[in-house]
Amino acid sequence: MNLSFSLSLVDGNKSASQIARVLTEGWLAYKSPELKAWQKTVNPPRRLGNERFISALFKDPTKVEDAEKLMTELHAVASDMQDVGLKLDFYQFFTEEELRDIYEQNNERMWLCNGQAPDNYGVTQRSAVSLWHNIVAEVNCALQGKLTATLRFGHDTPLYRLLALLGPGNLSDEQTDEMDKVIPMAANLQMVFYYNPDKEEKPLKPQQVIVKFMLNEREIRLLKVRSLDVGPDGKTGYYYRWDHVLSYVEKRIANAVAQGYMATINTFVGTDYAVTPSLSRYGKGTEEHGQTLPAVLEPNGMTFWTPQTQDGEQKCVAPYYYCDEKLQGFRGSHWLVGGCTQDYGSFTLMPLMDSLRLKPVDRATRFNHADEIAHPDYYAVSLPDEHLKAEMTGMSHAAMFRFTYQKDGKAYVVVNTNNDHGEGFVAVDTVRNCIYGYNPVHRIYQGWGEKSGFNGWFAVVFQDPLQDYGIKDGVAWAAFDVSKGDEVLVKAACSFVDMAGVYNNIQQEIPHWEFNDTRSRTIDRWKAKLNRVSVSSRDTAAVAKFYGALYRASFLPRAFSDKDGRYPSFAGSRKIMQHPMGKIGNTPLYRRVYMDFSMWDIYRALLPLNLIVEPTANGMMQSLVDMYEEGGWLPIFPCWNSYTSAMIGDHASAALAEAIVKDARNLNKEKAYEAMRKNAFEIADAEAYKDGKGRRAMQSYLKYGYIPLNDSVMEAFHTHEQVSRTLEYAYDDYAVAQAAKALGKTDDYRVLMARARNWRHVINPRTEWADGRWANGKWLNNKDLTTRVKFITEGTVAHYTWYVPHDVYGLMQAMGGKKIFADRLDRMFSDSLYWHGNEPCQQIPYLYAYVGQPWKTQQRVKTILDNEYLDVPGGLSGNDDAGQMSAWYVLSALGFYPVCPVSPYYIIGTPTFDEAHIGRFTIKAHHVSHENIYIQSATYNGQPYTHNYITYEMLKGDGVLEFQMGPKPNTEWGSKTEDCPPDLMK
């Protein structure tokens, strides 16, 4: 099979000149190293075996060492002999079915190795980039008037890879049994260029030139490129401006690069017990486990499609643990990833062979991690005892499963809810070929065990009619007779509204039965996500770890509304809500609503990261305002569509304040402030307070300016913890004050800024550490810095004393000055007092910037990045906490961190990558390496830059921040008083 390639430049009078220079064999035959490595792994299975073929040729088939290779090679010989003048016909040794089987296998191999197959994660497209750039260079020569006429010849594979990069919309290259229609013998691609010689003079600019593409003498259409209705030659067809094509292909290249990142992500990180240096330092029990999932999902989608090794929806038990040896099924999960909470509204399906087992513990079957393939868009595993391979891909509300059987027999698919209260419901619908049901959701923390007022509705839909089915003990099953090589396709979907929502979600997200198409659409969602932050480095392991962290930071908050915008009203009112946003044509649009905000964790880094890079962040913030309007109070820790009062603080207010100050779009700022103000100034009545509404211990806080030890804060999941609450309320008050200032609420601003100094009431002037205090003003005089105490949340006094993010200079003064402050910071690390496994410590490494010692931040942060984040299942120091731990890594690896999220300042750490792009903002780190971690100097847009912080305005702009890195600290850079972060209390 040959490729001919030509370029034509045609003027308005239709005279043409061939202008293409020879595509050298080097360009045509080029295979990138990653493509070569990938192609070695590609070995698509055949539907038929080789037993009949080998038995027909040999009396003793057991003597054949590699029967599959022999059969394949003889087929290749038979094909080659068509061109030889011999009467010998090797095809006679094959049956028609075997010839077709091998033909389809070869076509699939071609597609996997050179086409747009999801499995290759864009490696073929990336391999074609150099060829495309060579073509562009040739075109540029022609546009400048440097004309030559040549012919180019090559093989089919470079053309196929080039087509994969171009992505023509009218090719069905996923039809692997029709590959010869895409790239037949003598396949050719032509690019015909047009310009008007009466109006345009050479050299021509790209926007002055029109181009059309001809594949095998037929026009092809490029997706997402605007086509002219009529070409310069007066004919209808697909004509494009050359500059639009250039922009389109560069986006395709960027997407292919992002797709390559997906292939490197280890989705198992955090699914096993921690193996980091922080292990057993201060954590206990499940705190020393990442509690993550190797889930398939759409970024911030509703449902996480995950393998399951643990049944039920018990608190602190994740659906999957890497250390488990048996698989129970595949779950449509709403687990609060990375925490010690619980799943809700979930269901599980499990494929079985020959033996019907209903209970999760009975149907659990062995599996090997070597047989697992896990990516953000795809999960697959072989189950040897079930004689099948299970594959899964999914989107926000719906997923598709493909079960391929390795022998003849009876196949079962078992479906159950994961309701621990025995309230789940399942049924079979033979008209829709589905199993459906619902799983009632219950509250925890406040109102523990009460119904939340909504269900997790679901359906499992089969492509083929049910041959047999049944229900027993709350478990439903469907059965099919299968032969070796057969596939059973299943779709599943969820809704928190009703069954109509389930079926609409399926229709909207997966209206067909094309597994690879569904997977490709999920890949597209991830490419868009990963492209918002692009990094490049010679250290490929660091890049993989970075994008793995970004993956884990993309679970929560989750989409809560259906595709039609409907969702159950917050706090159990049982109303169904919907927020219209106009129409596109006749299609109505609805605002997506989000749920499950692990607020004590994510206001620190995850939500600030989202405000920088994630367009959906504004919708997340507006969802908090919705909760206020629907429930009457701004929630403290909104999960399970309920008030919870889990953890401490009032950080929904802090998060909304950051969004207001940083001018988030499509946010009702006045209504948001109304919600924040109510939490900051009002005390909930007894009934509302018991239900989880309002700040905990607010009466004491307003009366004393701190929460005394006398107030045990009983109406909360975390009782006591008075000092930590005071410190966090002081920050929340500061944050709300900034929102008040931005909105012109001057009286509120003055009151709240005074309250922002309340942290001083719990720093003992005698010890200069945080300490418990009684209502009469007397101190507890605690001297234990390293043991957990009741008045501190999930940590020690040494951890929490540093939590004054809005008044670091005030804390410095309270500790006795800059030197004592710096010495205590040193001690945090030299005496192993620092614990990265939980949130209260995570801003501490960046506090060196305030004392003019940024090189220590650089060293501490680099150590944490390297040691506390490992690309292995036990690679997280503690709970990932809805992605907060991973968001810390993302921001810190980029080179900055928001010590005070509501402020416009981000403290510079140590950049990890040669180059990073955050939207339009660029960070370059010259000479960065494992040794060169220290900043020697910096420039911003070419001008010297000595501040040890950057601003939100810089991050949202199009500037370039460049660092020169070295192996030794430069104690001059960023150390002067004027280079340190501003005092936020002035």
Segments predicted by a language model, with ranges:
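Extended hydrophobic/aromatic segments used for targeting, binding, or gating
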Residues: 120-200, 569-583, 594-597, 767-791, ...
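Accessory carbohydrate-recognition regions in carbohydrate-active enzymes
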Residues: 258-654, 660-727, 738-761, 767, ...
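Signature for phosphate-centric chemistry
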Residues: 1-150, 154-257
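ATP-dependent phospho-/nucleotidyl transfer catalytic cores
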Residues: 732
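Short, low-complexity Ser/Thr-rich regulatory SLiMs
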Residues: 193-204, 394, 405-407, 925-929
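Catalytic or ion-translocation cores adjacent to nucleophile or general acid/base/metal-coordination motifs
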Residues: 172-192, 622, 626-633, 638, ...
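Beta-strand signatures of extracellular beta-sandwich domains
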Residues: 212, 937-939
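Short strand-turn-strand beta-turns centered on an Asx-Gly dipeptide
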Residues: 216, 940-943
